[in-house]
Curated annotation (Swiss-Prot):
Gene name linked to the record: flgB
One GO term describing the cellular component: bacterial-type flagellum basal body, rod
InterPro entries linked to this entry: Flag_bb_rod_N (IPR001444), Flagellar_basal_body_rod_CS (IPR019776), FlgB (IPR006300)
Protein name as annotated: Flagellar basal body rod protein FlgB
Gene source species: Salmonella typhimurium (strain LT2 / SGSC1412 / ATCC 700720)
Pfam families on file: Flg_bb_rod
Disulfide bonds: none
Taxonomy, superkingdom: Bacteria
Family, per entry: Belongs to the flagella basal body rod proteins family.
Length: 138
């Protein structure tokens, strides 16, 4: 039964983990907007999610726990999976070699934030529905 519950929540869990990682990458791009030679980075979210889901099924028959902080107690958990970072190709290269386009980064940051919040909402509604069923509700 627990494996069915895990399977029901696996997609949202992994999507949220990747969204959080992407948010950190986008924040680093924004923080380094004025750093000469800094190369803006990002991930291909869809392909990374697919890789994580396939890898989770192959390794454990499910998706393993993910450590999000070095202060967490490891319990058969693995650290966040390494994602393939891609370099952004700038529309207009700057003279100092920095490839951060602040308009694009802010847009991507806001879009990723909204999708993260949507993922939390969907996960919350899935959990609420499961609790309703477990409590004998309609």
């Amino acid at each position: 039964m627990l494996d069915r519950l895990d399977a029901a929540l696996r997609f949202q869990q992994e999507a949220l983990n990747l969204r959080a990682q992407r948010q950190e990458i986008l924040a680093a791009n924004i923080a380094n907007a004025d750093t000469p030679g800094y190369q803006a980075r990002d991930i291909d979210f869809a392909s990374e999610l697919k890789k994580v889901m396939v890898r989770g099924r192959e390794e454990t028959g499910g998706v393993a726990l993910t450590l999000t902080s070095s202060h967490h107690i490891p319990a058969q958990a693995v650290s966040s999976p390494a994602v393939d970072l891609l370099y952004r190709v700038p529309d207009q290269p700057s003279l100092d070699g920095n490839t951060v386009d602040m308009d694009r980064e802010r847009t991507q940051f806001a879009d990723n934030s909204l999708k993260y919040q949507m993922g939390l909402t969907v996960l919350g509604s899935q959990l609420k529905g499961m609790m309703n069923v477990l409590q004998g509700g309609n």
